[in-house]
């Protein structure tokens, strides 16, 4: 809700931060606290805000109520997927390789009424995998690998191509010896 700041710039800034491999991306709504310069200049700057705590910006000349709602939902998406180590690498790649990914994934989560639901790590992994399967099949294997690396069940859909039953080790093992390095811990 900053003055002169548009919704498309928020999406651009998220892509820029993802490009820098930011560890986390936090989007929060602007609050106009009593006694601050921004609050004193709110009318001049075209900022409408809640008169009740936490005094959140509701609208500006540049960003509508519905666009601020989209920004809030984008924050939820980032918290659930980008800011979660298990899904961060895949989410970052999708953000960087397709300018429309955030818009598409947000629309997908919103249409499924999931954007405001609390979701377990497993549920988020299932959603991301299914979304990739439907919309980005070239990332399906990467989603499955992220699922397995996160320690999720091999009996669930993302691990569907992993063989776990009746697997017999080879008659002869190819043993590879190497040197232990403390940095491998």
Indicate where each model-derived feature is located.
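Radical SAM enzyme core and accessory elements
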Residues: 73-185
């Amino acid at each position: 809700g900053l003055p002169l700041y548009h919704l498309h710039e928020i999406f651009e800034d998220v892509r820029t931060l993802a490009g820098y491999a930011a560890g986390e991306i936090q989007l929060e709504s602007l609050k106009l606290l009593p006694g601050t310069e921004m609050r004193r200049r709110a009318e001049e700057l075209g900022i409408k805000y809640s008169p009740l705590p936490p005094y959140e910006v509701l609208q500006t000349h540049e960003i509508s109520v519905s666009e601020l709602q989209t920004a809030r939902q984008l924050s939820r998406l980032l918290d659930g997927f980008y800011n979660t180590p298990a899904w961060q690498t895949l989410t970052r790649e999708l953000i960087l390789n397709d300018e429309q990914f955030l818009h598409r994934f947000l629309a997908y989560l919103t249409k499924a009424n999931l954007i405001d639901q609390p979701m377990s790590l497993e549920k988020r992994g299932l959603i991301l995998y299914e979304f990739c399967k439907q919309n980005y099949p070239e990332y399906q294997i990467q989603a499955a690998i992220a699922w397995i690396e996160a320690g999720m069940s091999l009996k669930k859909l993302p691990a569907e191509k992993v063989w776990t039953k009746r697997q017999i080790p080879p008659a002869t093992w190819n043993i590879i010896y190497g040197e232990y390095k403390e940095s491998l811990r």
